[in-house]
């Protein structure tokens, strides 16, 4: 699915050409090759003392409304990945977390209009007050073997790894 039609450098139309083994968008005027790269998503795995995971229920004004997910969001252009994850968790849950180690990295193909690469971090809660905010309609703690309907297939992969004891502390 083509998302871009005009060159961001000179404004002219893109042509399709086979280059480097793929169909590419090439500017008809300046010859610039436009590479469509995935966007980086970040997610924070927050576990409580009972090893329940914090999930957010997606609000009605975002994609996949009413479904649950690990607190997540897109990385800003000039943002370090750990700081981006910490920001997203706080925006959606009210909790202030510290990024620990990377737990998982997955390519996300669930949205045909936008491929993402997701990075899931383990976290440590540093403070804050748990409340649904930003694009979250609700927040809740769930046992790893009793998870509600999820928005993203890759969250399911992460939860399976957590359930199978691949928790790194």
Give the ranges of each region predicted by the language model:
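Acidic, metal-coordinating catalytic segment for phosphate/diphosphate chemistry
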Residues: 2-43
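Charged phosphate-binding loop/patch that engages nucleotide di/tri-phosphates or the phosphate backbone
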Residues: 160-169
